[in-house]
Amino acid sequence: MRYLITTALAYTNGPLHLGHARSTYIPADIIYKYLKLRGEDVIHVGGTDNHGVPITLTAEKEGKSPEEIVEKYHNEIKEDLDLLGVEFDAFGKTHSQIHIETAQEFYLKLKENGYIYEKEIEQFYCPNCKKFLPDRYVEGICPYCGGEARGDHCEVCGRHLEPFELKDPYCVICKGKPEIRKTKHHFFKLSALKKELEEYIKNAKEMPEHVKNMALNWIKELHDWDISRDISWGVPIPGTNQVMYVWLEAPIGYISFTKMLGEIWKKYWLEKDTKIYHFIGKDITVHHAVFWPGMLIAHGSFNLPTAVVSGGYLTLEGRKMSTSKRWVVWVKDFVKNFDADYLRYYLIMSAPLFKDCDFSFDDFKNKINNELINIIGNFTHRVLTFTHRKFKKVPIVDEDRLKEEDKELLKKCEETLEAVDKNIRSFKFRDALVNILHLAIEGNSYFQKMEPWAVDDEERLKEILYTCCKTVKTLVYLLYPYMPKKSLALLELMNEELDLELRGNELKKPKIIFKKIDNKKIEEMKKKLYENKKEETKGGEKMEQIDISYLEKIDLRVGEVVEAEDIPKSKKLLKLMVDLGDEKRQIVSGIKGYYKPEDLVGKKVIVICNLKPAKLCGVLSEGMILAAEDDEGNVSLLTVDKDIKAGSKVR
């Protein structure tokens, strides 16, 4: 069996932060290193995603070429991954010639197989810049809150928007007023693959259950997919002036980057005895579990993913990470202050991969000092120091002559090897690390119970220390995928190779491998983080003062939600019927991710009643419900603190 491990392509608009490391890169590197350790045929392929609107926007605003932006961040991202100890057999760029050619060949095959068609759509066009404008190239006034908004989203009120909904829209490059023009786009017949995708997902035995459920829910309402964009930066669609939508061409990078290894790429993508594991963050689960397999099925030549392994979100000190709000810890900054292996240990031990978890500096210090160092570090150091002092090398004995308590610990080593193997292959990386920690606890207990310092019989002492060193060697072997640098440092002290055999080599002079984290460093990092937050808050845009007459223009009333239902086409919107006393109104609200429809019925809310009606996702909205949102993205509806009748004025 062959294994192909891939990691989500990092977007070249910034360096990596701890969230990237936790959800994607460290877990993928662990299984890659482990399978390699076990002698499996395995490769790890990754790279960077270089196309899409955000990169062209950044380039145009900074007066640089997209190539310059891409090159800068591609190099920074690779440096970050090197610092984390993440290894690749191939690491490419989607702006490389090999990728562009592979993506175009893939597209032409989809077209040849009848899965591509053209359809006329309407889009904003800038007559000054002489080009069509994707969502993010258009900004204007939000029709709901009056704040500055992008063509796809209002940062002020959190609403999902369509570009045509904006008031006073303008081109973000020249600030000119755009026109609405017709253009032909290319579509992928994803809806035609519903049956094949359902069958694939249901039969994917190694696919994590939560990924299966999410994919099957999406497949219920499968729509064809607009796969072209009217911009110049990207992979050109053959025979057109358009480029491919980034989510069509980026996953093809897994194939094109494997091609960087030469003809062996065919073994992993064309021959059937291969398992493909895609490691990603959970925000792009659907792209990898539905869209990408759909593309592969339509193409007809390549292996399908065996498993899509989606990692949960990482919050920071209890708050949602935000690069724009400077509430973030960059990989480069972190490893300047702390060992990368400590980060690898902590991020895996904090929670199962599929669940969200929080990074806390204090918890990081406690887990490393009180768990990793006090248990694993303490046991390995005691054993190697004592053995070096007594014999200068690992004593080799006949295992058949060992006492029962010795054999029990060695049996525990074998059981741990089996448990770790099963858990890592099932993507239960935390469970496997707990298995390793428990073996160290057993080793410590054995060492204490045997009291080697009190043993006068030299042969018996050799048996005890052989058993301890065998346990240390097992720990080092199993820890290597998690903490490669620390494991290799321990192996160097033992003068051993990275396997499970004890050779009785001369030990090197012991030294402390696992050093405790200094609380001073922790406080410095926390101070820097909170200072960044204060600076962002101070530097934030202050709203101008207004006259009370502005407030008098707003008709605010208490409403009671009498009906609430989902809008299936939208990820954020709910359709509500609100009683305002003398009438009922239909209101569309972007609170889907925060409230269930059934929990809203009967709730008193505050409504802006004289907002102009507008359509969201094709659904008429006749008002706006007010809600509060904090810096961490938590949302709470505004309500009244005691019962008051619907329709009451808010003054």
From Swiss-Prot:
It is found in: Cytoplasm. One of its GO terms (cellular component) is cytosol. GO terms for biological process: methionyl-tRNA aminoacylation. This is Methionine--tRNA ligase. GO terms for molecular function: ATP binding; metal ion binding; methionine-tRNA ligase activity; tRNA binding. ATP binds at T323. Pfam families: Anticodon_3, tRNA-synt_1g, tRNA_bind. Residues 550-651 form the tRNA-binding domain. Keywords: Aminoacyl-tRNA synthetase, ATP-binding, Cytoplasm, Ligase, Metal-binding, Nucleotide-binding, Protein biosynthesis, RNA-binding, tRNA-binding, Zinc. The keyword Methyltransferase does not apply. It is an enzyme of class 6 (ligase). Gene3D superfamilies: HUPs, Isoleucyl-tRNA Synthetase, Domain 1, Methionyl-tRNA synthetase, Zn-domain, Nucleic acid-binding proteins. Binds 1 zinc ion per subunit. It catalyses: tRNA(Met) + L-methionine + ATP = L-methionyl-tRNA(Met) + AMP + diphosphate. Its cofactor is Zn(2+).
